[in-house]
Swiss-Prot record:
InterPro entries (UniProt xref): PInositol-4-P-4/5-kinase_C_sf, PInositol-4-P-4/5-kinase_core, PInositol-4-P-5-kinase_N, PInositol-4/5-P-5/4-kinase
Superkingdom per UniProt: Eukaryota
Record's protein name: Phosphatidylinositol 5-phosphate 4-kinase type-2 gamma
Gene giving rise to this polypeptide: Pip4k2c
Biological source species: Mus musculus
Keywords of the record: Acetylation, ATP-binding, Cytoplasm, Endoplasmic reticulum, Kinase, Lipid metabolism, Nucleotide-binding, Phosphoprotein, Transferase
Length: 421
């Protein structure tokens, strides 16, 4: 796209999204909300500001074009770009020169639909208020203001891996009807500010947008070097590992039917990863203590969330959109407020798709959030070299983390099958 001097876009009002009901509900038509322009917040960080400006621009552009009847091979290679030079509008919000690129926009649009996430809700959840910076194992990690989406800064190699596996991933999501423990990839972007490229991957948050997690584990099924460091353990919410899980005699207390469904889904997902020669993935386990969660907490400081951006600064002037599926203006998690209040430990499974409540009569009243993470590592020459080095160090029979994809999968599934009471 040719260079241009343009004002920043505002996000269109939220429209579209899931219908009422609890459990795995399907979308139902509702009355339209009165549309209000949703302002993109003022970002102190130029990178975040450009990213959210770009997402608003992208969703506006997509809204002008009907979804394709079917995706073509070229859709998995496509991208949309915009370059802005000599930008003087709202200089406190955006740098004067920047570029934004969205990878495979029609593919991710289709994936969002298959994961029952409306584009307008996606936009509002990302752009209405500032995302929070949170701790990640590597790279930058942001969480949307409503805690439904995570934005992970990844490497160019990760983007290349995503590109090479995106067609297979999409086919798998179609085949399983979006019912999976894999990460729900919702958008992939490049942001260029001051001649530096940053790559952002947007996913659904595996944890709840309203139930806080009190304990967290990253489980790989390996026992070598799989204990949280002392530095990690003193954090408010440390990421504990396999040895910590065993040493604490931790167990997951869910019903037999839920366990059966979960393990069948996990096995199917892992078999898919083996086909792609992917390994080194983990099961992310978050535990919400219902008793602890029902205790009143002190209110924290109120964040400044007002935007300084004018509501009329629309890129290319697309109109605010009204969808046939009404949602509240708060984004992905917002519609829930129009239904009955949720009690302690209750959740909306249409939003908290990775959640399972503990069984009746379990010794602990808990909610578990379980999903697969770090699924981009393929078994290549680098991994083979690491495996050889670890074999020399620990011996061929040691429970080391770096093994062949088939071995990794078997060890992983065996370990996870034993985390349940």
């Amino acid at each position: 796209m040719a260079s241009s001097s343009v004002p920043p876009a505002t996000a269109p009002a939220a429209a579209g999204g899931p219908g009422p009901g609890f459990g795995f509900a399907s979308k139902t038509k509702k009355k339209h909300f009165v549309q209000q322009k949703v302002k993109v917040f003022r970002a102190a960080d130029p990178l975040v500001g450009v990213f959210l400006w770009g997402v608003a621009h992208s969703i506006n552009e997509l809204s002008q074009v009907p979804p394709p009847v079917m995706l073509l091979p070229d859709d998995f290679k496509a991208s949309s770009k915009i370059k802005v030079n000599n930008h003087f509008f709202h200089r406190e919000n955006l740098p004067s020169h920047f570029k934004f690129k969205e990878y495979c926009p029609q593919v991710f649009r289709n994936l969002r639909d298959r994961f029952a996430i409306d584009d307008h809700d996606y936009l509002v959840s990302l752009t209405r208020s500032p995302p929070s910076e949170t701790e990640g194992s590597d790279g930058r990690f942001l969480i949307s203001y409503d805690r439904t989406l995570v934005i992970k800064e990844v490497s160019s190699e990760d983007i290349a891996d995503m590109h090479s596996n995106l067609s297979n991933y999409h086919q798998y999501i179609v085949k399983c009807h979006g019912n999976t423990l894999l990460p729900q990839f919702l958008g992939m972007y490049r942001v260029s500010v001051e001649n530096e490229d940053s790559y952002m991957l947007v996913m659904r948050n595996m944890f709840s947008h309203r139930l806080p997690v009190h304990r967290k584990y990253d489980l790989k099924g390996s026992l070598v070097s799989r204990e949280a460091s002392d530095k990690e353990k003193v954090k408010e919410l440390p990421t504990l590992k396999d040895m910590d899980f065993l040493n604490k005699n931790q167990k997951v207390y869910i019903g037999e039917e839920e366990k059966k469904v979960f393990l069948e889904k996990l096995k199917r997902d892992v078999e898919f990863l083996v086909q792609l020669k992917i390994m080194d993935y983990s099961l992310l386990l978050g535990i919400h203590d219902i008793i602890r969660g029902s205790e009143p907490e002190e209110e924290g400081p109120v964040r400044e969330e007002e935007s300084e951006w004018d509501g009329d600064c629309n890129l290319a002037g697309p109109p605010a959109l009204v969808g046939s599926y009404g949602t509240s203006p708060e984004g992905i998690g917002g519609y829930i407020h129009s239904h009955r209040p949720l009690g302690p430990g209750e959740f909306e499974s249409f939003i908290d798709v990775y959640a399972i409540r503990s069984a009746e009569g379990a010794p602990q009243k808990e909610v578990y959030f379980m999903g697969l993470i770090d699924i981009l590592t393929q078994y290549d020459a680098k991994k083979k070299a690491a495996h050889a080095a670890k074999t020399v160090k620990h011996g061929a029979g040691a429970e080391i983390s770096t093994v062949h994809p088939e071995q990794y999968a078997k060890r992983f599934l065996d370990f996870i099958a034993n985390i349940f009471a």
